[in-house]
Regions:
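Transmembrane beta-barrel wall of Gram-negative outer-membrane proteins
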Residues: 243-267, 285-332, 351-370, 414-424, ...
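Gram-negative outer-membrane beta-barrel transporters
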Residues: 567-571, 590-674
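Periplasmic N-terminal accessory/gating domains of Gram-negative outer-membrane beta-barrel systems
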Residues: 75, 119-168, 179-193, 202-210
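C-terminal beta-signal and adjacent terminal beta-strands/loops
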Residues: 268, 274, 611, 664-681, ...
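A beta-strand signature from Gram-negative outer-membrane beta-barrel systems
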Residues: 150, 194-235
Length: 761
């Protein structure tokens, strides 16, 4: 009997213990969620590296505890060090690292615009897509669309394949995916980002003062990186909107190996939604697919896109790690049309494809870090156009732009003094670009292939003073272009000074070069949809692009109120007239020169309880000199948008998020015709002075909302151009078959709704 009672008591004890344990487990939440709660409750911001926080569970913070007690409790639970600074910023570091000084990529402004966007020392703007709450006009996170909300980023044509940063053209930006250069940056030929936001942990925008380890990008760098999640459980996510379906998987394959995989495919070749129809009309309005085209009527158009990415991480030991990356991006358009009232259907197609793969090795021991990467990438754009001549299908034009790039990158970092780091490395790049045309009837073939091999050595010193009052980096990059037997020396500098507790002053400077650029041979190339083609410098009529830039920034932060002001001067030498996209008297000119840009960027951001408001203003003055044109005088570039203003507000209410934004800017330049004498004697259009007129001002309002379910699901609604404002993005003129002048306007995207649904496991 006594034994039975003891057994019963023991069972009760176990049962109570299980209940207690279950209750405690239910109270456990992810550390990153606990930090979000503390930030809202106590008006502080945390500075941390993503890999420090992954998959750590803690007790749910109590509402009535002081911030100091909360941090002490988190220290006990996580064994991480929490350092509270005077400005309300909290530095999180591993305990074993806290005994020595580490020169951090310090966050100086956190959660600007929306959660997940921060400004770091050196002017680097960092975006963590998987922390996004909401941005106006977006139903789902979009990496490159998000960048366009930032100061200094303008887009005259409102396409992701034509992003302008501080007056530069799109090809002057360096897009890196896991350190591999990307030559294709848009789905739907420039309306959707092709990079999955649910695997990319961090996106960095660098406009100036970049590290010497980066080559290319005379205008800016957009860097996208995957990172190991260290998860012990499989994570799966599915999502859809009115354009595509997508899924991702993060799973441990073993204790030392992790797989990250994502895939997305448009269903636009099967189902056409209002979003698809509006996107289609926007992109193809100047092509044969335009239903208003009097000479060509398109039928049977089928368009789709897909992207696939995968990363495998393997940890041999604490010192040695391996990473393998794979990416495939594809856009495909097929359609048939009738020409000149002939009922015969003529097939045409246009495709873009990117393939990239790399192997990365990482070594870390004490104060030394070493990274090595081997990579290969291939980009191709191919089109087939069939033309009817005299009612017969007897002319076919095939065009191709092909890039193959491979190379080696070695990078080391050594901390040889407490507050001094030395970075060093070597990069080898082989870039080959082919441009080919094949015409049937009359027979014509053109095949041009250029290859440039570049060797680069780089080194950099970084210093951080006591109490983080001063931080500075100075670096040098030496490029040797083997084909031209040319050396190019590129200094880089970044200086940061903190004063009066709330103010930060920053000076940045750099020199850069690049051998790739985009040109337009004929407006109707590649169906007139993506008519730019990549080329290589030949050090003759296509010079190596070289840039110089300096900037000065002042930043102020007091609790949740932020003001930043930054001014810059930039010059790029080696620009060509064929890269500018002229549609006037300079359309077929072939000369080169330089471009000058100067400007001011302002950001005002405030958070009050659950409401965020921010204003961005940009002033830009962009002019270009091209030898032999415009009386050898500077004139405004096609990207010369002098003033732009954006007002944004977001509100968080329980599981709901709302965001609305108004975007305004002055009209871009265009070249008008001489109304007194519109035609020259040789039946060509008589233009006025180049880019001496401006389009009407641009205005657009965007709206978004989403709701997060407790079962890790989310539904979202976005409306792009809520007021359906009619904006003209470009105006140019052509002659028809009767030598009458036609005015052609390119219109912006009208009111476009989108709905998304996502669920994660």
């Amino acid at each position: 009997m006594i034994k039975s009672k003891k057994k019963f008591s023991f069972i009760c004890f176990l049962f109570c213990l299980q209940i207690s344990f279950s209750q405690n487990t239910e109270k456990k939440i992810l550390l990153i969620d606990a930090l979000n709660f503390i930030e809202k409750k106590h008006n502080v911001s945390f500075n941390y590296s993503n890999d420090v926080l992954e998959n750590i569970l803690v007790d749910k913070p109590k509402k009535n505890l002081r911030i100091e007690l909360l941090l002490e409790k988190l220290f006990i639970e996580t064994n991480l060090k929490f350092t509270l600074l005077k400005d309300g910023q909290i530095i999180i570091s591993k305990k074993e690292e806290s005994e020595k000084v580490t020169i951090l990529d310090e966050i100086i402004l956190n959660n600007i615009l929306t959660k997940g966007i921060s400004v770091k020392k050196g002017g680097k703007i960092t975006i963590r897509p998987n922390e996004f709450k909401i941005l106006p006009g977006l139903a789902e996170p979009d990496i490159l669309q998000s960048i366009q909300s930032l100061p200094g980023v303008l887009n005259a044509n409102k396409k992701l394949s034509d992003i302008n940063i501080r007056g530069g053209t799109h090809d002057q930006n360096l897009f890196l995916w896991n350190n591999i250069k990307m030559y294709q940056t848009g789905h739907f030929f420039g309306l959707i980002s092709p990079f999955n936001p649910y695997l990319i942990k961090e996106v960095n925008l660098l406009k100036n003062g970049t590290s010497s380890k980066y080559g290319d990008g005379v205008s800016s760098i957009i860097e996208m990186n995957n990172k190991k999640s260290n998860t012990k459980e499989t994570k799966v996510g599915f999502g859809t909107d009115l354009i595509s379906l997508d899924a991702f998987l993060i799973t441990p394959m073993s204790k030392k190996t992790e797989l990250q995989f994502s895939a997305r495919r448009a269903y636009t070749d099967v189902l056409r939604t209002i979003t698809y129809n509006n996107f289609f009309d926007r992109i193809f309005q100047d092509s044969d697919l335009n239903p208003n085209n009097a000479q060509n009527t398109s039928e049977n158009e089928k368009f789709f896109f897909y992207d696939i990415s995968a990363t495998i991480y393997h940890k041999f030991s604490k010192k040695h790690q391996l990473q393998v990356n794979f990416l495939n991006i594809n856009n495909n358009l097929k359609y048939s049309n009738t020409q000149n009232t002939n009922s015969f259907l003529v097939p045409n197609n246009l495709s873009q494809n990117t393939f990239a793969i790399s192997t990365d090795y990482h070594f870390k021991q004490n104060n030394l870090k070493l990274d090595a990467q081997l990579f290969f990438s291939k980009y191709s754009q191919f089109s087939t156009v069939n033309n009817l001549i005299n009612g017969n299908r007897n002319q076919i034009l095939n065009q191709e732009n092909l890039i193959q790039e491979n190379g080696l990158k070695l990078h080391g970092k050594y901390q040889f003094l407490d507050r001094l780091d030395l970075s060093f490395g070597y990069q080898l790049n082989e870039t080959g670009i082919t441009n080919a045309e094949d015409v049937v009837s009359p027979s014509f073939q053109r095949f041009i292939k250029e290859v440039v091999l570049t060797h680069s050595l780089f080194y950099e010193l970084a210093y951080q003073s006591v109490a983080n009052k001063f931080a500075g980096k100075i670096g040098f990059r030496n490029n040797y272009f083997e084909k031209f037997d040319i050396f190019n020396f590129e200094p880089r500098v970044s200086l940061n000074y903190n004063f009066l507790n709330d103010f930060k002053l920053e000076f940045l400077g750099e020199m850069k070069s690049q051998v790739t650029s985009q040109i337009i041979d004929l407006p109707q190339d590649f169906l007139g949809v993506e008519n730019k083609r990549w080329i290589l410098s030949n050090n003759d009529n296509i010079p190596i692009l070289k840039s110089k830039q300096v900037s000065l920034a002042l930043r102020y932060k007091k609790k949740n109120f932020i003001v930043t002001a930054e001014t810059y001067l930039k010059r790029i030498d080696g620009v060509t007239s064929r890269s500018q996209g002229f549609q006037n008297q300079f359309e077929f000119s072939n000369t080169n020169g330089n471009q000058k840009s100067s400007g001011l960027e302002l950001l005002v951001h405030n958070k009050f309880k659950n409401v965020k408001t921010w204003i961005t203003y940009n002033f830009n003055n962009n002019s270009i000199f091209l030898e032999g044109l415009n009386n050898n005088s500077y004139f405004p570039t096609n990207q010369d948008i002098r003033h732009s203003l954006s007002l944004n507000t977001s509100v968080e209410v329980n599981q709901f998020n709302f965001a609305i934004a108004g975007n305004w800017h002055t009209g871009k330049p265009f070249t008008s015709i001489n109304t007194t004498n519109p035609l020259e004697t040789n039946s060509t259009i008589n233009f006025n002075t180049v880019n001496s007129n401006n389009l009407k001002n641009y205005f657009r309002v965007d709206f978004s909302m989403n709701y997060t379910f407790k079962f890790k699901g989310r539904i979202g609604l976005s409306i792009w151009n809520l007021l359906d404002t009619k904006n003209i993005l470009n105006t140019y003129y052509n002659l028809d078959e009767n030598n009458f002048i036609k005015t052609i306007n390119t219109n912006s995207l009208g009111l476009t709704p989108n709905v998304s649904f996502r669920i994660n496991f």
